[in-house]
């Protein structure tokens, strides 16, 4: 992120009082005038970003997944409807462990993928996240881009080139596993296992890939009613796909505090980690 800010002086990062807990302190010291804490007001933050983008600037918004829902109206009316190029760094996507039910980021994927013109990315590790940041900086946008990443530490390393998807394993058979985000890195691999770095819109050949398999398993740190699982089911219906779609998801519940891996095991992923 520091390299991006150094090479692009017109990029500003806004955050509604969430920099402190997210490792941005060194960047705030180096780029004090370009990392703007807008206070605890998510809707105001997003509308401010819309104004900066409308004036020709390049705003990025850093915000926790669980608090992004407070700005849903502004995302639709002030950014998506206006086709403004705003990058959202959606921090703490998925289960966050000890922060508990107020901070689990399990709702945003369901509503983000229903916004016209939105693009949604979910990296499987820190290297892919770095590549996404570089791609977001270089790519011309005509709507919001959401990069969803978990509360976690990474060992660093070189960024990987951005690709919409990656085959983690491909060995024949009639079953396809589709996963996204950090789950792709954490879980056991299926005999045919596709990681979707770009959750939405689906890449061009995804329909053809689905048609090659009789049973589709979708893995997601969400309720599975919308989001990736819902979109896969809808696409299969459009294709008149005769196979089954089996979702591996979280329950519709406010999940308690606890270590992230423990919570995943207790809420639907016990045999997959």
Please state what every model-predicted region is.
Residues 6-11, 15, 20-29, 43-45, ...:
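Thiamine diphosphate
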Residues 1-5:
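Flexible inter-domain linker/hinge segments
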Residues 56:
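Conserved G/P- and acidic residue-centered "switch" motifs that form tight phosphate/ATP-binding loops
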Residues 34-46, 59:
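Active-site cofactor/substrate anionic-group-binding motifs, chiefly glycine-
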Residues 48, 59-63, 72-76:
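Catalytic phosphate/nucleotide-handling subdomain of diverse soluble enzymes
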Residues 122-140:
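Conserved glycine-bearing catalytic or ligand-binding loops at nucleotide- and phosphate-handling centers
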Residues 41, 63-66:
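Short, glycine-rich nucleotide/cofactor-binding loops
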């Amino acid at each position: 992120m520091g390299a991006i800010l150094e090479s692009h002086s017109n990029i500003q990062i806004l955050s509604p009082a969430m920099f402190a807990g997210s490792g941005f302190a060194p960047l705030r010291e180096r780029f004090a005038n370009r990392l703007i804490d807008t206070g605890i007001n998510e809707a105001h933050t997003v509308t401010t970003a819309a104004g900066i983008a409308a004036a020709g600037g390049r705003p990025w918004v850093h915000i926790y997944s669980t608090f992004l829902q407070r700005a849903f109206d502004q995302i639709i009316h002030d950014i998506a409807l206006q086709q403004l190029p705003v990058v959202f760094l959606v921090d703490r996507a998925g289960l966050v462990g000890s922060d508990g039910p107020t901070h689990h980021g399990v709702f945003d994927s369901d509503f983000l993928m229903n916004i016209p013109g939105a693009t949604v990315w979910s990296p499987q590790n820190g290297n892919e996240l770095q590549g996404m940041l570089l791609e977001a900086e270089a790519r011309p946008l005509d709507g919001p881009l959401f990069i969803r990443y978990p509360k976690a530490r990474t060992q660093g390393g070189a960024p990987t080139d951005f690709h919409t998807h990656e085959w983690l394993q491909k060995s024949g058979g009639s079953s396809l596993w589709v996963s996204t985000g950090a789950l792709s890195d954490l879980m056991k691999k299926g005999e045919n296992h596709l990681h979707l770095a770009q959750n939405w819109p689906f890449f061009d050949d995804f329909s053809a890939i689905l048609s090659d398999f009789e049973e589709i398993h979708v893995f997601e740190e969400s309720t599975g009613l919308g989001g990736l699982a819902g979109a896969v089911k809808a696409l299969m219906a459009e294709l008149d796909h005769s196979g089954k779609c089996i979702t591996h998801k979280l329950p519709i519940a406010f999940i308690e505090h606890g270590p992230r891996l423990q919570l995943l095991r207790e809420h639907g992923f016990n045999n997959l980690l």
